[in-house]
């Protein structure tokens, strides 16, 4: 596989120390990334394996577009068994930054980590030179000190994915960090820690072969000038502007006159009006610190940054000298939940320092720098919501030993004092006391602390599944569409295909026109909190959303920006280009490709995930044992009937019908929700069908 793929799998057995090379072309029908990860895990990690068992594996997988220069393509899919949900089923972490590109430049599509080292090690990769190095001197350090030490030993160009103390201590809600703030979560930090693997350091010099460089350049120019919007591909500005027909205050296209990177080197830089067409100014459109934290963040913002080969720059970079008072660096940044979640635990809000709302900005940078250095992971904010629930409902007072409860500075919590966050995160990362079990995950604390139905049914806690994972653009995002999407994976679904479309900022009439073109009817698309009963078009919308995220996690592309469903260009009538993934695929690999073929590959990957989940759970009845939804989704807003303006609560009968229709659309058993022999055969998964049949896991 000379173009796009490298053709190489690097297998590292930590138990034996053996490092071997395999051919990745045997998995080509699964494209890459998520597809490679699921196939390797299905073949090699049997039911009954626990996440910290030596037999569990950690699969880092890229795709043919990774590192190619295609916009937003530096993603690595990390597949393993869940540390934090019921049943320890297969999950993925999705890590940006520079690690994925360096993997490809070094010559690897996949890195398989297996076994367990006798003592701490780190994996050193420089092109074809691969070795396991002693890491005793790194054990106990945070992700940043670890990265700095390894870069001193290797090169400033080395990209290091490291765990902190949380991963070392097998904290279920832990992850790994590369390039300072780019995380891979889902418990993968604890998996690395269980294997005594402190870090993977990669430096590559080979590049990625492109079949048609001229076409690649043309596609890049086309996407950058005609199609791409801002973060989450929002395609209208957040304020009325001279060039824009529409605006939406919720849009992440936040650039405007009078809004500055206030702490930029050399003096403030105005973001200004950024009409489409100029590739060099795309990076000004998204201003996440102000979007996430409010106007008080402006004076501390140095710039926006981001992943390799991404023009959007959704990662805030701030410099707040006062933060040093709390023992952390004054610089740092992130995006989305990681930017703002830390001060949400304060019942009365964070305490301000000098300016209005600066407590939120300062407190979150302190929290962010601690959280990332320890290698903790928030489970899409669920860790902090669980804290709030347990504090407000008196759970901590009930379950913590009296001595431990007395030594915690609850007065700091009430006062919004950032020092509480310091103590809280230290306890979590170092497994100090009963409180630290909060980072075991929602399912574990519900069992351990006997939280009962009140916990699962509490709407503000936002737990979607009784398996212990939260909503991620669920019923509030196109009702049944988001609800189906949130049922399908074994963690929060990490799917932005539908929410990017919903949040684009275009008016409802235009959105419904696009929905009709894509899904056959305007009825696919409802106004938020004014939704209608399920219909066939909504099912097609849900399937499209899921297949696109699987495709993006396979090729790999960032699903926070892709697909190009709509455009900022009035001259295109705001239409995007949903065949762009196939066009890039062809230009990079040289293989003839249509979007229909890629969609079929995505369906193969998605169905393999379903089949592996069936196998791990040892049940065919996915409807009643897996695709479960917490009661608050149906019981919220008791004064407003379903299908009435003002609510996004779901109807139980309608949701049952929605799942039945979706199962049929996928070719799964309409009652059980598991793949059929016919569908597995249609998708080229005959070996999976035979294996499931041998275990009596196919429907009659």
Protein language model features and the residues they cover:
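Extended C-terminal regions of large enzymes
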Residues: 53, 74-76, 151-186, 192-700
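N-terminal amphipathic, basic-rich helices that act as targeting or association modules
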Residues: 1-64, 70-72, 163-165, 182
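A generic structural signal for short, non-catalytic loop/turn and secondary-structure boundary residues
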Residues: 2-5, 14, 51-55, 71, ...
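Short, glycine-/Ser/Thr-/acidic-enriched flexible segments
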Residues: 14-17, 25-26, 63-67, 83, ...
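Extended catalytic cores of very large enzyme megasubunits
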Residues: 4, 19-20, 24, 65-72, ...
């Amino acid at each position: 596989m000379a173009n796009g793929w490298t053709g190489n799998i690097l297998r590292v057995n930590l138990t034996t120390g053996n490092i071997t090379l395999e051919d990745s072309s045997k998995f080509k029908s699964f494209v890459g990334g998520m597809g490679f990860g699921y196939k390797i895990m299905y073949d090699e990690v049997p039911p009954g394996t626990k996440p910290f068992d030596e037999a569990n594996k950690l699969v880092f997988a890229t795709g043919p577009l990774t590192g190619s220069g295609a916009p937003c393509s530096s993603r690595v899919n990390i597949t393993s068994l869940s540390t934090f949900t019921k049943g320890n089923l297969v999950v993925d972490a999705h890590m940006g930054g520079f690690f994925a590109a360096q993997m490809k430049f070094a010559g690897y599509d996949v890195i398989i980590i297996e076994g367990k080292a006798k003592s701490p090690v780190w994996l050193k990769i420089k092109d074809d030179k691969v070795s396991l190095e002693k890491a005793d001197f790194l054990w106990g350090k945070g992700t940043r000190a670890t990265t700095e030490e390894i870069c001193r030993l290797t090169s400033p160009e080395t990209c290091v994915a490291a765990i902190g103390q949380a991963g070392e201590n097998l904290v279920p809600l832990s992850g790994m960090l590369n390039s300072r703030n780019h995380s891979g979560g889902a418990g993968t930090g604890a998996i690395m820690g269980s294997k005594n693997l402190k870090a993977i350091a990669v430096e590559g010099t080979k590049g990625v072969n492109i079949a048609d460089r001229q076409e690649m350049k043309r596609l890049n120019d086309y996407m950058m000038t005609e199609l791409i919007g801002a973060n989450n591909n929002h395609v209208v500005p957040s304020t009325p502007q001279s060039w824009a027909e529409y605006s939406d205050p919720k849009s992440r296209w936040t650039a405007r006159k009078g809004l500055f990177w206030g702490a930029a080197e050399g003096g403030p830089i105005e973001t200004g009006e950024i009409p489409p067409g100029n590739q060099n100014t795309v990076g000004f459109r998204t201003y996440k610190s102000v979007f996430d934290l409010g106007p008080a963040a402006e004076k501390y913002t140095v710039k926006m940054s981001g992943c390799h080969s991404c023009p959007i720059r959704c990662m805030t970079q701030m410099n707040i000298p006062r933060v040093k008072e709390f023992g952390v660096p004054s610089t740092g940044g992130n995006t989305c939940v990681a930017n703002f979640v830390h001060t949400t635990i304060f019942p009365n809000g964070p305490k301000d320092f000098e300016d209005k709302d600066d407590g939120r900005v300062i407190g979150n940078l302190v929290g962010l720098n601690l959280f990332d250095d320890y290698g903790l992971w928030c489970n899409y904010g669920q860790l902090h919501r669980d804290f709030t629930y347990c504090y407000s409902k008196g759970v901590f007072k009930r379950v913590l030993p009296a001595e431990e409860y007395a030594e915690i500075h609850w007065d700091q919590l009430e006062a919004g004092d950032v020092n509480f966050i310091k103590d809280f995160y230290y306890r979590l990362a170092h497994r100090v006391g009963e409180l630290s079990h909060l980072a075991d995950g929602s399912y574990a604390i519900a069992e351990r602390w006997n939280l009962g139905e009140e916990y699962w049914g509490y709407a503000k806690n936002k737990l979607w599944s009784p398996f212990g994972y939260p909503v991620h653009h669920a019923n509030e995002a196109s009702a049944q569409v988001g609800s189906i999407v949130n049922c399908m994976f074994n963690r929060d679904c990490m799917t932005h295909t539908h929410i990017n479309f919903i949040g684009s900022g275009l008016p409802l009439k235009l959105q419904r026109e696009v929905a009709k073109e894509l899904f056959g009817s305007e009825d696919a698309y409802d106004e938020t909190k004014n939704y209608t009963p399920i219909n066939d078009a909504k099912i097609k919308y849900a399937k499209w959303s899921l297949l696109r995220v699987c495709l993006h996690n396979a090729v790999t592309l960032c699903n926070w920006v892709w697909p190009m469903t709509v455009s900022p260009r009035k001259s295109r009538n705001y239409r995007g280009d949903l065949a762009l993934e196939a066009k890039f695929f062809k230009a990079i690999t040289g293989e003839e490709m249509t979007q229909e073929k890629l969609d079929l590959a995505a369906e193969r990957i998605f169905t393999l995930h379903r089949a592996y989940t069936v196998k791990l759970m040892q049940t065919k009845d996915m409807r009643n044992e897996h695709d479960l939804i917490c009661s608050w989704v149906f019981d919220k807003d008791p004064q407003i009937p379903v299908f009435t303006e003002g609510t996004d609560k779901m109807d139980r009968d309608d949701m049952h019908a929605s799942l039945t229709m979706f199962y049929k659309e996928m070719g799964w058993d309409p009652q059980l929700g598991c793949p059929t022999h016919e569908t597995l055969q249609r998708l080229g998964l005959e070996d999976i069908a035979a294996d499931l049949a041998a275990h009596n896991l196919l429907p009659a």
